[in-house]
Every structure is written in C-alpha cells, then in structure tokens.
C-alpha cells in the first residue's frame, strides 16, 4: 500500500456541502466504510475554510485506485494526487 495526498477544489457555486443530496453522500464516501470498497484507507481529511479546497491523506494500492475513489469529487471540480511518505519513511531513507 502507498500513501497519497489529494487535493480537490471546486467553485463556490458547485459546493457539494450546500447540496442537500450531495453533502451527506460525500460524508459517507469519505468514511472508513465508504472508502473500504475501493481498497482505500482515509488517514485524514480537512477543508480549508472559505476556500472550497479539500485535502485528504489516503493509503491505497496505487494512484489508479485513488482516482477511482475520487470520482465523485471530479464531477464537481478538480482532483490532484501526489505520492507521499510519512516523516518516518523520509528520515529512514535520509531524503524527501
């Protein structure tokens, strides 16, 4: 399993948090139960207040699984995925 950092951004007009159908669906999607069918583990998530930007720290078999999991977010905005490492891994290999 590999670690990934994901950023999703959308326009205010398309904010899923304000949509009475989409908001609850996305909450369920980022839950452990929602991520499990994709083989993804959510280690953390946060939204930048007022910026319509959502970050996730995910563990998954590969980037393709992350993109599949992030599909609903891609319907309302952009999705960027970066391979990542824990601080412990970086120190062990002595480089970022």
Where are these regions (language model features)?
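Short active-site oxyanion
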Residues: 53-55, 78
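Short amphipathic alpha-helices in soluble, non-transmembrane regions
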Residues: 66-74
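Conserved short beta-strand edge segments in small beta-sheet-based binding/regulatory domains
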Residues: 76-88
């Amino acid at each position: 399993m590999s670690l990934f950092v994901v950023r999703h951004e959308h326009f205010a007009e398309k904010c899923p948090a304000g949509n009475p159908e989409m908001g609850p669906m996305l909450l369920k999607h980022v839950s452990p139960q929602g991520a499990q069918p994709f083989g993804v583990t959510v280690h953390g998530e946060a939204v930048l207040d007022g910026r319509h930007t959502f970050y996730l720290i995910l563990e998954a078999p590969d980037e393709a699984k992350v993109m599949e999991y992030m599909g609903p977010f891609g319907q309302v905005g952009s999705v960027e995925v970066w391979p990542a490492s824990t601080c412990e891994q970086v120190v062990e290999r002595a480089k970022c």
